[in-house]
UniProtKB/Swiss-Prot annotation:
This is UDP-galactopyranose mutase. UDP-alpha-D-galactose binds at S171, W175, Y200, N297, R306, Y345, Y380. Keywords: FAD, Flavoprotein, Isomerase. FAD binds at S25, E44, K45, N52, H71, I72, R374, I381, D382, M383, D384, R385, A386. It comes from the Bacteria. Its EC number is 5.4.99.9. Belongs to the UDP-galactopyranose/dTDP-fucopyranose mutase family.
Length: 399
């Protein structure tokens, strides 16, 4: 691993592939290419690898935490499971999310029959559960959008609670716009469980976090003689001029896999794609455990969306009398803004998707560039899907 700047000390022309971005997508792709005998120059603008999955030990408490917010691995994809097996020894963590509301109820997400019994009086809860069992016997889940269409008073009572107290205010903060302006599909993806199964990832075959952390696992992936990893690389190493890909201002015909911001690649010629970002306030407490659940959602707080206690996720340092917690506040991504300087969630509304399509058309006109990852594809991508896409891209490039 080399920390000096590129390109002063490297002959990029000797590599079979150049990969820009050492997040989960770029790392997985580079590893697979190297395993098939291809040399890879892997470039990263940050001074660490792992993208937003990066984790490290806190200097004050000595506890492992995720610098860019919590990442819980989960998948039912066998190819993905086979790939991670040599690198991820998952702990036994099962994801749990608590709700901090304006009452003392101990509620968790996703909503299931047990949560309905806590929230509603006995008669209403029993009527609601019986209704679901009679009318949806084969369904495991219903979406919030489906609940909205059911003309039954207890269902509407549940729907209104979830919309007004839980998912509505959370979404307003998350996306920075009034509820009526948020794409209905956002709330439509929210599901309740029609059983006692409160699993946050009910379809996952495996879930958890890698013992020792993601950074340790990713470092192992890139520890290959055919991978040359360079950190602290300027983001503008790759540029485009008249449909010609330039690398360090020199024309290049080698295959380049680009995992960065697609609008930045083209100099923001059509304007900037919008993202939501997050600001983290870090707190340390001299206690073994600070909160009841690893993640506490705060839908009714004016600014904060959630609070995360990392030792409950990592299952490391549980006996320590110290703990580290992050409070997340969402905001609009603005380059150079110290609070919201990282692009996290693409704002996939009609106008931004149309803008992305224009940039994608430009990229498709360049034969030797390949887009990969959430920033290049302007998509929110779970970790297992990012790995699956990288495996598929590697297979395509090796043909």
């Amino acid at each position: 691993m080399t920390l000096f700047s590129f390109p002063n000390y490297v002959n990029w022309n000797k590599f079979d592939f150049i990969v820009l971005g050492a997040g989960i997508s770029g790392i997985v792709l580079s590893h697979v290419l190297a395993q098939h005998g291809k040399s890879v120059l892997l470039l990263e603008k940050r001074n660490q690898l792992g993208g937003n999955c990066y984790d490290k030990l806190d200097e004050t408490t000595g506890l492992l935490f995720h610098q860019y917010g919590p990442h819980i691995f989960h998948t039912d994809n066998q190819k993905v499971m086979d790939f991670i097996q040599p690198f991820f020894e998952l702990n036994n963590y099962q994801h749990r999310v608590g709700l901090q509301l304006d009452n003392n109820l101990d509620l968790t997400l996703p909503f299931d029959f047990s949560q309905m019994r806590k929230l509603l009086d006995t008669k209403t809860a029993s009527s609601l559960i019986n209704f679901f069992q009679q009318h949806f016997p084969a369904e495991k889940h219903l979406t919030l959008m489906q609940l909205q269409t059911i003309n039954f008073a207890p269902v509407q009572q549940l729907y209104q609670f979830l919309k007004i107290k839980v998912y509505g205010p959370y979404s307003v903060k998350m996306w920075g716009m009034p509820l009526e302006q948020i794409d209905p599909s956002v709330l439509g993806r929210v599901k309740i469980s029609l059983s006692e199964n409160s699993s946050y990832f009910p379809t996952a075959t495996i879930q958890g976090l890698p013992k020792g952390g993601y950074t340790k696992a990713f470092t192992k992936m890139v520890d290959h003689p055919l991978i040359d990893l360079r950190l602290n690389c300027p983001a503008n190493l790759i540029s485009v001029n008249n449909n010609q890909l330039l690398f360090a201002n020199q024309p290049i015909t080698k295959p380049v896999v680009y995992c960065g911001l697609i609008d930045q690649l083209f100099g923001y010629c059509f304007g900037r794609l919008q993202y939501r970002s997050l600001h983290f306030e870090w707190k340390r407490y001299a206690v073994k455990q600070h909160q009841a659940y690893p993640v506490m959602n705060w839908p009714l707080h004016p600014t904060i969306t959630r609070q995360v206690e990392y030792k409950q996720l990592t299952q490391e340092g549980l006996e320590s009398n110290q703990t580290i917690v992050s409070c997340e506040t969402p905001g609009a991504f603005r380059e150079g803004d110290p609070r919201f300087m990282e692009p996290y969630y693409p704002l996939n509304d009609v106008s931004n998707n149309a803008l992305f399509a224009r940039y994608l058309k430009l990229a498709n006109a360049i034969p030797n560039i390949h887009l990969l990852g959430r920033l290049a594809l302007y998509q929110y991508i779970d970790m297992d899907r990012a790995i699956a896409q990288s495996l598929a891209k590697a297979e395509q490039l090796l043909q």
